[in-house]
Amino acid sequence: MDFSKENTQIRYLNSLLVPETGSTSIPDDTLDRHCLKTETTTENLVAALGGSGLIVLFPNSPSGLLGAHYTKTPQGSLIFDKAITTSQDLKKAYNYARLVSRIVQVRSSTLPAGVYALNGTFNGVTYIGSLSEIKDLDYNSLLSATANINDKVGNVLVGDGVAVLSLPAGSDLPYVRLGDEVPSSAGVARCSPSDRPRHYNANNKQVQVGTTDTKTNGFNIDATTPTEVTVDMQIAQIAAGKTLTVTVKLMGLTGAKVASRSETVSGNGGTFHFSTTAVFGETEITQPVVGVQVLAKTNGDPIVVDSYVGVTVHGGNMPGTLRPVTIIAYESVATGSVLTLSGISNYELIPNPELAKNIQTSYGKLNPAEMTYTKVVLSHRDELGLRSIWSIPQYRDMMSYFREVSDRSSPLKIAGAFGWGDLLSGIRKWVFPVVDTLLPAARPLTDLASGWIKNKYPEAASGRPLAASGRPMAASGTFSKRIPLASSDEIDYQSVLALTIPGTHPKLVPPTEREPNSTPDGHKITGAKTKDNTGGDVTVVKPLDWLFKLPCLRPQAADLPISLLQTLAYKQPLGRNSRIVHFTDGALFPVVAFGDNHSTSELYIAVRGDHRDLMSPDVRDSYALTGDDHKVWGATHHTYYVEGAPKKPLKFNVKTRTDLTILPVADVFWRADGSADVDVVWNDMPAVAGQSSSIALALASSLPFVPKAAYTGCLSGTNVQPVQFGNLKARAAHKIGLPLVGMTQDGGEDTRICTLDDAADHAFDSMESTVTRPESVGHQAAFQGWFYCGAADEETIEELEDFLDSIELHSKPTVEQPQTEEAMELLMELARKDPQMSKILVILGWVEGAGLIDALYNWAQLDDGGVRMRNMLRNLPHEGSKSQRRKHGPAPESRESTRMEVLRREAAAKRKKAQRISEDAMDNGFEFATIDWVLENGSRGPNPAQAKYYKATGLDPEPGLTEFLPEPTHAPENKAAKLAATIYGSPNQAPAPPEFVEEVAAVLMENNGRGPNQAQMRELRLKALTMKSGSGAAATFKPRNRRPAQEYQPRPPITSRAGRFLNISTTLS
């Protein structure tokens, strides 16, 4: 394994799916020194008369042979055109090779003279066997060679083209010999590339041979490399002087011979044995061989070949070459049209001794996790939509998906849209276990792939999973099934609870989103934006900001499977220590347990009372509390962890009014009165956790019988929230023939319910009895919850509007009565004596003045003990904050001081932000980015244009500058300006500033017109660099007291010593 760096990209899988990314070493345990090489293939295939032809490809061939092209005559016979090979003959420079990845694309974009439309289509199929095994190569019958929809494409326009991808069928790929030359004393000797030769044996009984060619034997073989054919005959008497000629022919796909050998034997008047071996070298096999024929004839009387004719074929194979084979047939192409074939092949190559002197090789790097991930993904290629042959537009569209598949850390957005995200996520968790998670992967891959995906996403003829509407699946949220609303780019429905309600309901959305938006089909959508059709006016209800403060608004319910370290896995077989127990009431629900590299689902029953004697000893002390503080034995009471973070102990969102016990179940047998005989087992599973059993707990505490169904879903009040692992839970219910009722995120339930009343209705409908329904079902179980319903109905809309109306800023009018005035006077008198009562009176006045009496009264009826109000006030934002103004609008006019305080705080916050941006910019060398400059620039740091302007000119850019194109400089007129431009920068940069020109002129003056020496040039370049970068290094230079630059005039000669000193002092002054 390569431990030098951490890389989440699976490079080998990425090269397999997108060979254009280049070659990489296969991360298996074959560690030979090798070099990587990418070879291209380009061929122009000309359509013959009739416009039909055949392209045979060997996608997994490790050599330079990729396939062959055949044209078809108008009569329907095939004619061999050319072999398709890589651009370089690999065997001339390399001895061994191993294919990493390959893609071959065929399309047409040219028209012959006189043709004005690009006609013709492709049919393509990848067959797991060999070429000679395909009986019908006709265009219309070719697709029947395989039933796998991911291995064929049909009726693809030649302008679109097809792409053939090399997907390996195994992982133990050996290096193969390429047929390179070996040292020889005479002639040319080559090492045969037939690394794993095939053997064919065929016998024929008595055959009579005449004076014309008689086929004594013929059968199919497959060969692309040197082949040996041995023929054995037992020949009857041949007259002396007569001869027998035996011919061995290798036959191509067209039916014509590829190569042949003949041998003649003379008769001796007796019976004798004849044997010959025909060796066909690489230069003779110019096209794929699909058959061998053995012919015989005599120049005299007919003879009889007694006993048998035996033919043995040896050789002709290279691993990966002969199978699988891809055949692309084209039809109705204009005569003379050019089909462009292009391919990219990535290899691991071992150079020959001469090349090894000049090319560096490296060992392969073993990476078991990367190799395992690649093998698991390829083993599920059908479920993940990985095809061996594509139409080119479809292949290009899937590039982003390929990047997701080959990067184990990328979010599975595209895979999730097609329904493949769960499978890929399970593969990742299994192959790359996260260190800080308590348990490994949870989902059995093969069952999920073969069952859930195929059932939920049927395949079209093209092999692409489709939704029920026939359109490709797209990422979508939880919407009503009655409204065809797809996902919107502006709203993340995966993390936001939302309802889609028919009609326009502006009160249900925030004030800033009450203006409806238009949809493409001419309707209105309120509270959101969408690029899809809605089929009518709709309103998208999201949690309002003020609703987030309600403690009853919990996140989406989800199973959180818990396991203590001492009971991690389900290890004992079901049915151990079982016992049949009769229960008159209860409710069934499924659970999911996680173990080492596997998961399992089981059925449990919730019954009233304490039945710990039926439980496994290790969980008899485990319990969880309900909303009314009753105990549920068999549930966990330990603190559990989610993604490594500790969570509080489990408490069910349901009131049961009694203690309950949950027990594992193997089978259930119902009686006529609604009671049941339950096969209770000890299964050594850990204590149950999660809210998905809350429906069963509510029903078990209310119903007088055991319903014939299993229930799952989280109760929030009387409404049901969706839970996870629906498909796994459905398996537990289906094992004993029960339906799964509830609400799950993956749609695994058989019957979806939205409220507890729906669950009770289903429970009564499932029983063929006269049991009457008690009125308490669905009401006494309610506990601190808020609705979450996948399909909005009129009752939900009314509930929403009633709740919002109850908190509007209005109240019923009050009637002034003398008793009220007297009571208020008594309260005021009491407030003067008791400070606490004074506060209460202030609160009463505030509530009455704000019109909140009815709203708070309704709140008090639901908030027992003020728990929710206390939590809400604890998280309440401070007065005048931005969130408050966004929710409730600006403060009243009379509160001018509050408004000014808010503005002051906002200004201070902006200045603090500008200070942070300014400090970062100055650390990066932008000295001009002061706090005031950042504020004028919109509280933003320097953009690329401003940075470029500053570096090019050394001047402070203007705030708001968005584009800067430096002007080309012109040649300066005087010597100082020319020299300054040369030292300051290249001609395409901004001209040297006047200050730098003065510095250069001063140096010229000091040197009597000569240029600067080395020390002066070093100083000038450093000054130029400082001026251009604008860094603080300029402070390290002490400014010189120089006179202004002027035209150079030579000084008059001074002869006296005093005069020279006088001149120097004048210069330095």
From Swiss-Prot:
The active site is at S692 (nucleophile), K729. InterPro entries: Birna_VP2, Birna_VP3, Birna_VP3_dom1, Birna_VP3_dom2, Birna_VP4_Prtase_dom, Viral_coat. The keyword Ribonucleoprotein does not apply. Residues 504-534, 876-900, 1031-1069 are annotated as: Disordered. Changing S692A: Complete loss of polyprotein processing. One of its GO terms (biological process) is proteolysis. GO terms for molecular function: metal ion binding; serine-type peptidase activity; structural molecule activity. Keywords: Capsid protein, Host cytoplasm, Hydrolase, Metal-binding, Protease, Serine protease, T=13 icosahedral capsid protein, Virion. Specific enzymatic cleavages yield mature proteins. The capsid assembly seems to be regulated by polyprotein processing. The protease VP4 cleaves itself off the polyprotein, thus releasing pre-VP2 and VP3 within the infected cell. During capsid assembly, the C-terminus of pre-VP2 is further processed by VP4, giving rise to VP2, the external capsid protein and three small peptides that all stay closely associated with the capsid. The N-termini of VP2 and VP3 are blocked. Capsid protein VP2 self assembles to form an icosahedral capsid with a T=13 symmetry, about 70 nm in diameter, and consisting of 260 VP2 trimers. The capsid encapsulates the genomic dsRNA. VP2 is also involved in attachment and entry into the host cell. The precursor of VP2 plays an important role in capsid assembly. First, pre-VP2 and VP2 oligomers assemble to form a procapsid. Then, the pre-VP2 intermediates may be processed into VP2 proteins by proteolytic cleavage mediated by VP4 to obtain the mature virion. The final capsid is composed of pentamers and hexamers but VP2 has a natural tendency to assemble into all-pentameric structures. Therefore pre-VP2 may be required to allow formation of the hexameric structures. This is Structural polyprotein. It comes from Blotched snakehead virus (BSNV). The lineage of its organism: Viruses, Riboviria, Orthornavirae, Birnaviridae, Blosnavirus.
